[in-house]
Amino acid sequence: MKKVFLMIATGLLLTTSCNQKVKVDEKIKVVDSETMEEITDMAAATGVNNTFVDIALPGPQGQTVRVRDYVGQNKLVLIDFWASWCGPCIRELPHVVKAYELYHGKGLEIVGVSLDKDKASWLAAIEQTGQKWPQMSDLKGWDCEGALFYGIQSIPANVLINEHGKIIARDLRGEDLINTIAQQLQ
């Protein structure tokens, strides 16, 4: 019985988020203490109550998209980390679309950061899921510069930034996302 429970629990855990998976024989990274300190510092720097870190990556047509171009011009900016191959991301996107539809005209902008590697899949998913907001991706998967800056280890993930550039929330889902945005825009 314990084995069955553990198998079910493991299955549920694996389906709740898309985690970075690296085969040991495929990719081994040795991280020295100095590099680990830099990673830790960056993760701490992008936590709640800190100033956002700008991301500048190619957009769908190759143009450079910068988060800083939206912060300050909007009351709130949501950086949404996702990928076309991530089932939980696709299931969460209707909530993000709903938030955009309800609050875009009231001061919300969303900037999507895709962890895709295939441009055609990325662009098709944008269209199929109704994402009308700015998008960016360097098509490097988990090595995406933006994901590294924000210490993203699983997706979907997001960062909510106020008009002053302060990170006010991270990893909001479903109704929590919509309710937090509503409260911040009052």
For each feature predicted by the language model, list its residue ranges.
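N-terminal targeting signals for export/organelle localization
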Residues: 1-54
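Conserved segment of the thioredoxin-like fold in thiol-based oxidoreductases
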Residues: 51, 101-143, 148-155
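A short beta-strand-turn-helix
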Residues: 56-77
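Extracytoplasmic and endomembrane cell-envelope/extracellular-matrix remodeling and assembly machinery
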Residues: 58, 62, 118, 177-179
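Structural cue for short, hydrophobic secondary-structure segments
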Residues: 78-82, 114
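Conserved redox-active cysteine motifs that mediate thiol-disulfide chemistry
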Residues: 81-98
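Thiol/disulfide oxidoreductase modules built on the thioredoxin-like
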Residues: 130-131, 138-184
